[in-house]
Amino acid sequence: TTYGKILYPAQSDTIAFYLNGYMEYAWRHVPLSLGHSPKPIPLVVHPNSVLSNGFVTWGPRRMEIVSQHDFNASPEPWLLTLSLHENRHVVQTDKLNRGIFRAATYLLGDQGIAPAVGLVPLWFLEGDAVYTETNLSSGGRGRQSSFYQPFRTHLLQHGRSIYPYDKWLMGSYKNAIPNHYQFGYMMVGYGYLKYESDIW
C-alpha cells in the first residue's frame, strides 16, 4: 500500500479491505493542509475488542486501529473517522521531526521525536486532528451537537467564559470542562479562521 504495511488477523480481511480504502483516501488528502508528506507507517488492526480507539506511537513507529465502531460516533463509517484522525497525527509528528529533533532521532531512535511532541500542547494536536477529520468527511466529531454541549452549558450558565486558560487547559474535577479534543477543536478552528494555513 502507499501508506505502509497493514497487519491484521486472517479472519479480518473484510475489515482490512475497507480500512485500506479509507487509509488510501486519508493518505492522499490529510497531508495537503500541512504541506508535508510523511514516510509510510505500519498499520496494526485489532478487530476483536470492546474498545473503539486508535493511536499513533513512535516507539516503534506505527499506527494501531481498534476497529469496533464507537457507540457515540457519527453515522459516518468509524474506520474513516479513525483513518483521518490518526493519519493527521502521523503527519503532525513526522513534520515535527526536523532540526535538532531530527538529530535526536539519530541518537535515540524513534523516541528522539518525543521532546518535539512534548512541546506542542495536547489540545493543539488533538484539536487539529478532529478539525481534519471533520473537514475531510461528511461526519466527524466537529459536526456532532454533543461535541459542543460543554461550551453551550458554560455560556448559558455564565453568559461568558469565567474560567482562566489554565482551567480550560487542565480540566477540573469540580466543574464541567471540555476535554482536550473539544477545547482543541474550538481553538484550532478559531486559529484556522484567523490565520488560515499559517497556524502550523
Regions from the language model: what does each represent?
Residues P60-M63, S74-L82, V90, L96-G189, ...:
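Acidic/His/Gly-enriched intrinsically disordered linker/tail segments
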Residues T1-P115, P121:
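Juxtacatalytic substrate-recognition/specificity segment
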